[in-house]
Amino acid sequence: MITNIVITGCSTGIGIETAKYLKERMITVYPTAREQEDVNKLIELGFENALLLDVTKPETIANVIEKVLQKDGKIDVWFNNSGYGQMGAVEDIPTDVLREQFETNVFGLYEATTQVLKVFKKQGYGKLIQHSSVLGLVALPFRGAYNASKYAVEGLTDTLRLEFANTNIYPILLNTGPIKSDFRKNAIESLDKIDTENSDYKQKYQEAKSGNSKKVPFSLEADAVASIVHKIILAKKPAPRYYITKATYILGYAKRVLSTTLLDKLLLKV
């Protein structure tokens, strides 16, 4: 029987590229997006199984699960890919902006996770792929909200892995580094949600908005993530964690071997 996968956050970038990659390899893909306009675009691209899903609206998650089960009678893999990065110094981020970051990156992911786990438990198997980040391993300045959200995803998924040990249900973390997509552009646009004009970091924000900030090294194309997702689908027993991009390997290794003081010095140079 052909394997199927539900992917959240397929309007652009990693989500849509992963959907294309898997479809080309005969995986039944259910790409989702939170706006009907984007769902229509997916359908125009040949994804007849495209569905509307906004992780901040539990009823849309339930609707997708119901439709997939009606059509296939199972869900093999669920990829929680939705998310965005809120930029800004911690002191500049209003509580409601931090809360908004968590609504998508943490609470939305959590809602999708708990709903699909009920399906996995009933059918006795399933692979749950959680899109974390290199910033779920280490922190960077002006990424506090995003860092906090991904650290939360790490904690939830590490716990799930222990709770589902010795079963055929596999919670899996992707620690992705810099990928060529709209993610960084969207992160810079998120600065509009904070008061950059009256901040001590006004100049840094202006540099980010003007595109004059430091270029991101070791960036890969979105299919670097897609190929790992495909590897997970094919694996009988997938690894609990996958590093993607050299930056993740370098910083992940640095966190294991360096003291906190030395790691901080390294991260301030990134």
Predicted regions located by residue number:
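Conserved glycine-rich cofactor-binding loop
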Residues: 11-12
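Residue(s) in the substrate-gating loop at a strand-loop-helix junction
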Residues: 133
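Substrate-binding pocket helix/loop in short-chain dehydrogenase/reductase
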Residues: 89-90, 97-99
